[in-house]
């Protein structure tokens, strides 16, 4: 990877503009999860320690360009950064045409999505961003898949463009998992629909040794194998696609193990009566809501023997206690495994939290959409721009 790293640069006396992902949930002016803010602090501290004059910006929500609104303001984030850094972090509202900041100071530049031209990667705006700094640092992996003025255009025009520690840690972990994995490489891909994870499945099937499918996705694969899935969520029109993915796996000696037993209910309710059935016992009015204990034990054994595990999606309706055991079994197997493990996606992170295994997963991706697009084999605009500047 030819990307210039912020950690390698002399920043003494330099004006440094850092694009962070500070898009945190805010309810009535109160931040309800500050994980992204906390994650950004080491990068800001590093820039300060290196003697830089630090400017930080981020998006928050989806404001209308050209209009300021309190609900989309980074004001609560500035207050939290002031506390976490132990120094005053003023919020600058109109900043595109110039910012006053001295070495040793930090300013937070108001929500960049309020700037006209941000979303369309406007060149004139990107050049103005670039003119604010000596060094631009892209540290927001979660927006690396968006070609916008603050995530792409500015990289082209800044005097120096570098990858920040958070972004580089994410790219290093993903490269380790996919480009040069310890074998066997096992991926868990679960979710409600094959259609939303189709590109992901099609890309991973050419890389992995084992591909475990879960949730509604698994139901489509179960139906493709000729089993009745009752009234479970599935996509009959994608059965030929599922068969093709299975054939592709088989052709290169990879395996897509299907459940042998499942947990079913008659209703989709948190307290629905759950029963374990083998695949051939599923009734026409059954809903498959989790993998069965026999299947979970088999999958856990595969995880225990894996060299690398990529996890995207819970394998059952883990929010409902009777249908949470499959996901819990796999989560605990990943935690106990010696494999290099990477987990990402909103529901996956909720499962990691629920079973308190964060410290036992090698790398937790906060990237969301960018994580998925990387797994799909797509080029991320911000990464491509940084690589071009690093040549």
UniProtKB/Swiss-Prot annotation:
Taking the first listed entry, what is the main subcellular location of this protein, grouped into a coarse class?
A: cytoplasm
Q: What class of enzyme is it?
A: transferase
- Gene3D superfamilies given for it? Phosphoglycerate kinase, N-terminal domain
Which annotated residues bind ATP? 197, 319, 345-348
List the subcellular locations: Cytoplasm
Q: Which GO terms describe its cellular component?
A: cytosol
Q: Which UniProt keywords apply?
A: ATP-binding, Cytoplasm, Glycolysis, Kinase, Nucleotide-binding, Transferase
Output one GO MF annotation: ATP binding
GO terms in the biological process aspect are:
gluconeogenesis; glycolytic process
Keyword Metal-binding among UniProt keywords: no
Residues binding substrate are 21-23, 36, 59-62, 113, 146
* Pathway the protein contributes to: Carbohydrate degradation; glycolysis; pyruvate from D-glyceraldehyde 3-phosphate: step 2/5
Catalyzed reactions:
(2R)-3-phosphoglycerate + ATP = (2R)-3-phospho-glyceroyl phosphate + ADP
- Asked if the Swiss-Prot or TrEMBL record annotates the protein with the keyword Transferase, the reply is yes
Q: Identify the EC number(s).
A: 2.7.2.3
**Record note on quaternary structure:** Monomer.
- State the HAMAP family in the record: Phosphoglyc_kinase
- Report the sequence similarity comment from the record: Belongs to the phosphoglycerate kinase family.
Q: What is this protein called?
A: Phosphoglycerate kinase
Which species is the source of this protein? Xanthomonas campestris pv. campestris (strain ATCC 33913 / DSM 3586 / NCPPB 528 / LMG 568 / P 25)
